[in-house]
């Protein structure tokens, strides 16, 4: 949420002289650096492979491409956060980029949740109701769903654009800091409950229901021959659920506890410091979903592994035959036949 990185700081200055500034700066700069590198190269590679094998059209490919784009848009702003925390909370990039960097993190967070939920729902439909709803799981419908998710998240996340930069008492420009006035704090609390219900609880329940139905359906078909497909589906369920629990659940639970903690009358210095550290850890975990998503692509029922194999063969083939310019036309024709 707005200023989640340092939310407790302004509430503890009058009572607690200790701070977690050093801990915060070290953890955020380290975690965001790692997420930037791993997330950028992982999602760039996945996106490149998916685009290169776009002739293998499927609804799940559409969701995976959009998920990779959301991750890349986020990781491109994380280096700005790294610079901010390396310089001990000094912002050098202007008010617009301050707002945009905050906004990008939460757009990615909730786009990832909704794309994963949509993938889970349509996979459930494909496995549990393969005949009755065969026209529901199509690439065209997947595009409409993705456009709807982007529009919904972009609009509903717009309040995060209100998180502007400002000058502190030492004339340093600050960003990602907590709201100061009571009215804004109440607004943040309302925003939290809306995002908690619609951005986490409903999607999480949907995923659990879908995966329960998938598992029950697969268990009923244990005597059938498609054992490899069943193993791939269960593997995907485990990875998606684990990523959801590790990245999103700790952040939303901690945020709920944190906001109520801020409104309590009695807060010891130790409890304030512990709460501040929990903010740092859970927000870092939430941002790390950019690194987990490439694993989701890999475990999406073997589809991505097949694409990767196809991509590798095409790449090796092109490298082998590039010098033979006279043979380029028949080779291209052969590839078209294979596709």
Curated annotation (Swiss-Prot):
Glycans are attached at residues 6, 171. One of its GO terms (molecular function) is leukotriene receptor activity. It is a multi-pass membrane protein. CDD domains: 7tmA_CysLTR1. Residues 52-59, 130-143, 217-232, 300-339 are cytoplasmic. GO terms for cellular component: plasma membrane. Residues 1-30, 81-108, 165-195, 254-278 are extracellular. It is found in: Cell membrane. Disulfide bonds join 98-175. InterPro entries: CLT1_recept (IPR013310), Cyst_leuk_rcpt (IPR004071), GPCR_Rhodpsn (IPR000276), GPCR_Rhodpsn_7TM (IPR017452). Pfam families: 7tm_1 (PF00001). PROSITE patterns: G_PROTEIN_RECEP_F1_2. Keywords: Cell membrane, Disulfide bond, G-protein coupled receptor, Glycoprotein, Membrane, Receptor, Transducer, Transmembrane, Transmembrane helix. The keyword Protein biosynthesis does not apply. It comes from the Eukaryota. The chain crosses the membrane at residues 31-51, 60-80, 109-129, 144-164, 196-216, 233-253, 279-299. One of its GO terms (biological process) is inflammatory response to antigenic stimulus. Belongs to the G-protein coupled receptor 1 family. Receptor for cysteinyl leukotrienes mediating constriction of the microvascular smooth muscle during an inflammatory response. This response is mediated via a G-protein that activates a phosphatidylinositol-calcium second messenger system. This is Cysteinyl leukotriene receptor 1. It comes from Rattus norvegicus (Rat).
């Amino acid at each position: 949420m707005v200023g989640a990185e340092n939310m407790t700081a302004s509430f503890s200055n009058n009572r607690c002289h200790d701070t977690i500034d050093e801990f915060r700066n070290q953890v955020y700069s380290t975690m965001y650096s790692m997420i930037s590198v791993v997330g950028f190269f992982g999602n760039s590679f996945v996106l490149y492979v998916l685009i290169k094998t776009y002739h293998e059209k499927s609804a799940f490919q559409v969701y995976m491409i959009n998920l990779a784009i959301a991750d890349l848009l986020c990781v491109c702003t994380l280096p700005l956060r790294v610079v901010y925390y390396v310089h001990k909370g000094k912002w050098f990039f202007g008010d617009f980029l301050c707002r945009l960097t905050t906004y990008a993190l939460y757009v990615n967070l909730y786009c990832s949740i909704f794309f994963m939920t949509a993938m889970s729902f349509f996979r459930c439909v494909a496995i549990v109701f393969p005949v009755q709803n065969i026209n529901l799981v199509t690439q065209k419908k997947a595009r409409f769903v993705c456009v709807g998710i982007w529009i919904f998240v972009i609009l509903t996340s717009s309040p995060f654009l209100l998180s502007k930069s400002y000058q502190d008492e030492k004339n340093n420009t600050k960003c990602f800091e907590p709201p100061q006035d009571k009215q804004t704090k109440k607004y943040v609390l309302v925003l939290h409950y809306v995002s908690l219900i619609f951005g986490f609880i409903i999607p999480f329940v949907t995923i659990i229901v879908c995966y329960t139905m998938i598992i029950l359906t697969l268990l009923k078909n244990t005597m059938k021959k498609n054992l490899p497909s069943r193993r791939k589906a269960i593997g995907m369920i485990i990875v998606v659920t684990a990523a959801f629990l590790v990245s999103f659940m700790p952040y939303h639970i901690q945020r709920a506890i944190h906001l109520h903690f801020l409104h309590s009358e009695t807060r010891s210095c130790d409890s304030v410091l512990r709460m501040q550290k929990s903010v740092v850890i859970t927000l870092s975990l939430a941002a790390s979903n950019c690194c987990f998503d490439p694993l989701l692509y890999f475990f999406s029922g073997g589809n991505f592994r097949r694409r990767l194999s196809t991509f590798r063969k095409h790449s090796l083939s092109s490298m082998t035959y590039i010098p033979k310019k006279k043979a380029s036309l028949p080779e291209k024709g052969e590839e078209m036949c294979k596709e």
